[in-house]
């Protein structure tokens, strides 16, 4: 059994965190020649490509099977005749996969295994002409059938179109049951298993997401091409599709009542990309008239004007649990747990003052919830026992020093019907992705009350991949009455007698948290560490993980309190580790990009910055972006009502103070942090005589999708930091203490 490298199990002696295994070939490499630099970067990129990614996992309700998706190896990694291989590792319970079958573009495998990861079978889709992608793995209530989405039967020019397929739990041949023409997501079985439901945007497969590239802004803006996402149902065996929610409400997520007679969903008027921040909670009978159960814009109390997510019906259908709080990004959830009567009424906060951020939940009994929370920079799974509308009692089950997911929602796990087994995808800075499973102790009501078997890997697909960077440690510090946490990555082959440069990597959001994870191919903190830097990843005020007071402390104060937290973290690291304060770098993406623009106008400590999808002027940004509704909860009013609140946090208003050489990168069709924001900052730095470079990537959105662009950003960033943070030698000998 491969145990998770960073787990703390409640009421147990088992407490151990990342071991920091390093590659034997790892070397400190900052002041390298261009040829050596390019070689080192290529080596890092190849190591990241060596990893096969899990994108979804689902436990059968009876707890006897687990399904997952995993990326195929790239063509360069294939051997033999290229045939797909997927079989149980002889003499062990964990599964291994082989390379893709078609020798073309890497795709994914869909596999079904026994609960312990043994006896793996790879699902086949007949007449598939290319590599495939899979998502939304959903078991039928009787555990006999797995439904899922795939783009297998569409040509290479239409790989964004997904359809619904089904495969028997004991089989490998899947059957296509739909021929859809539009975006589909959040597949689910209706209670009883007679129908399938999903979110559907008819006639348009363009992702409705703030991070995706925007469409060309042509035609009547606000009217032409507005997507309408509705809940649709069809017979489980295939048949006619029916949309059961009105076109006037864009549905973001939903849940069925246990009897299948009502829906609860989060929705707002189209366009959906912009209006999630003002969404309401609705209930509705299938095909009936929607009823507003909760409108955060008008409710009294702490929830007023905030965001809501993850609605879940109680087993008896009398209440709906959800998460409410200050959230900057759809799909990145954190806040408090609330209960509200299904027919409406006053919502009750059952986790008031809790010093963690619940992120996902599900009912496990009439008065019990299983809640996955961001705790510091880790993930904690707990049972919350409810006491009416009073504060719930938390019973922690285990904490994982990483983020977890099952391919549906942030921090979600997949759970058996009796709540005694769960599975999730996990990785750390030290361990590549695998599927993990845990066995839970339940009481007579099937409510989890303890851990029988802590999380352990049931796959070993990436067991041979080792990091090329140093160990990671959690760092805590106090600042202005707040407890702040961050992660520190070490350079490879760390020598405590040398002094190293430090790069601060600021996460996006601000309502988010950086938790350990194996890096994707492309730009991020880990490749920086692999090149010989210390990398600090702080979770300053405004982040999830320390409770709602901490998260909301950034309101009307962006760039100030959070920057002071970050600088205090740098001081903490410098006091404990051999960091050269004269070689500090700063970087981040999205909100981290904003901080990388704003911080150099407030402090001269940073000698170089790499700005990803940044934001330089909140005033002009308000009229440029496609998601302006997100700002009012943070600034208290629109820019037209209170422009000074926006000017206060705008780098452009303080640009004469900026002396930091800055590389700026952005996507051409970024709707969340539009390219003009980067142009403004670049133009201003040039006017001030500050070294700068701006790169705009064709066709990219807020989150880059093209591998060549991801690589290019990383290469440019490493060269930029190498130029401004390097010295004549890779590291300096530390002064004697």
Set out the residue ranges of the language-model regions.
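Blade/loop signatures of beta-propeller domains
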Residues: 29-41, 107, 225-234
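A short helix->beta-strand "capping" segment at the edge of beta-propeller domains
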Residues: 32-52, 241-243
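Residue-level detector of Asp-centered blade-edge/turn motifs that repeat once per structural unit
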Residues: 61-62, 141-142, 191-192, 258-259, ...
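A flexible loop/linker signature enriched in serine peptidases of the S9 family
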Residues: 70-110, 127-134, 149-165, 179-185, ...
């Amino acid at each position: 059994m491969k145990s998770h490298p960073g787990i703390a199990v409640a009421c147990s002696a088992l407490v151990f965190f990342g071991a920091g295994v390093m590659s034997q070939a790892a070397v400190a490499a900052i002041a390298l020649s261009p040829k050596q630099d390019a070689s080192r970067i290529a080596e890092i990129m190849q190591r990241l490509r060596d990893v096969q990614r899990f994108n979804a996992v689902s436990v059968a309700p009876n707890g006897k099977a687990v399904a997952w998706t995993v990326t195929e190896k790239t063509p360069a990694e294939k051997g033999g005749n290229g045939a797909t291989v997927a079989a149980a590792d002889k003499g062990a319970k964990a599964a291994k996969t082989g390379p893709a079958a078609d020798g073309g573009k890497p795709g994914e495998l869909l596999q079904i295994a026994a609960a312990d990861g043994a006896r793996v079978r790879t699902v086949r889709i007949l007449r598939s002409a290319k590599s495939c992608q899979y998502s939304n793995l959903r078991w039928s209530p009787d555990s006999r059938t797995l439904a899922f989405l795939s783009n297998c039967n569409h040509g290479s020019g239409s790989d964004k179109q997904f359809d619904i397929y089904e495969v028997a739990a004991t089989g490998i041949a899947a059957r296509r049951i739909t021929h859809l023409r539009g975006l589909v997501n959040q597949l689910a079985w209706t209670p009883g298993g007679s129908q399938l439901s999903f979110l559907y945007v008819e006639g348009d497969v363009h992702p409705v997401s703030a991070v995706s590239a925007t469409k060309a802004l042509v035609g009547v803006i606000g009217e032409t091409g507005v997507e309408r996402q509705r809940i649709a149902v069809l017979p489980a065996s295939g048949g006619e599709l029916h949309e059961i929610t009105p076109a006037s409400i864009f549905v973001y997520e939903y849940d069925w009542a246990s009897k299948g007679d009502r829906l609860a969903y989060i929705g707002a008027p189209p366009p959906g990309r912009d209006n999630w921040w003002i969404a309401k909670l609705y209930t509705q009978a299938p095909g009936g008239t929607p009823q507003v159960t909760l409108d955060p814009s008008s409710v009294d109390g702490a929830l007023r004007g905030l965001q809501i997510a993850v609605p879940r019906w109680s087993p008896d259908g009398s209440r709906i649990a959800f998460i409410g709080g200050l959230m900057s990004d759809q799909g990145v959830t954190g806040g408090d747990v609330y209960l509200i009567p299904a027919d409406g009424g006053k919502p009750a906060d059952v986790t008031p003052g809790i010093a963690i951020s619940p992120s996902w939940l599900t009912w496990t009994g009439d008065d019990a919830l299983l809640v996955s929370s961001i705790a510091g920079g880790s993930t904690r799974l707990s049972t919350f026992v409810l006491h009416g509308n009073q504060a719930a009692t938390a019973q922690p089950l285990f904490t994982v020093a990483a983020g977890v997911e099952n391919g549906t929602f942030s921090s979600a796990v997949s759970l058996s019907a009796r709540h005694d087994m769960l599975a999730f995808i996990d990785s750390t800075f030290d361990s590549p992705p695998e599927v993990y499973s845990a066995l839970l102790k339940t009481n007579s009501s099937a409510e989890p009350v303890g851990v029988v078997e802590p999380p352990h890997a049931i796959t070993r697909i990436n067991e041979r991949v080792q990091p090329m960077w140093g160990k990671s440690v959690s760092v805590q510090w106090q600042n202005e009455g707040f407890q702040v946490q961050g992660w520190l990555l070490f350079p490879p082959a760390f020598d405590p007698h040398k002094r190293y440069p430090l790069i601060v990597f600021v996460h996006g959001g601000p309502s988010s948290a950086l938790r350990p994870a194996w890096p994707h191919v492309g730009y991020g903190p880990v490749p920086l560490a692999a090149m010989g830097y210390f990398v600090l990843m702080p979770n300053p005020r405004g982040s999830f993980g320390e409770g709602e007071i901490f998260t909301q402390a950034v309101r009307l104060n962006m760039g100030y309190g959070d920057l002071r937290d970050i600088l205090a973290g740098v001081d903490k690291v410098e006091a404990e580790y051999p960091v050269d304060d004269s070689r500090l770098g700063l970087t981040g993406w999205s909100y981290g990009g904003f901080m990388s623009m704003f911080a150099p106008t407030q402090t001269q400590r940073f000698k170089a910055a790499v700005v990803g999808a940044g934001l330089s002027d909140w005033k002009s940004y308000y009229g440029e972006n496609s998601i302006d509704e997100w700002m009012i909860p943070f600034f208290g009013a629109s820019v037209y009502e209170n422009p000074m609140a926006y000017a206060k946090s705008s780098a452009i208003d303080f640009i004469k103070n900026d002396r930091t050489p800055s590389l700026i990168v952005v996507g051409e069709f970024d709707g969340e942090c539009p390219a003009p924001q980067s142009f403004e900052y670049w133009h201003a730095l040039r006017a001030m005589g500050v070294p700068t470079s701006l790169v705009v990537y064709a066709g990219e959105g807020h989150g880059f999708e093209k591998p060549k662009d991801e690589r290019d950003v990383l290469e440019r960033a490493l060269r930029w930091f190498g130029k401004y943070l390097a010295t004549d030698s890779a590291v300096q000998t530390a002064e004697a203490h």
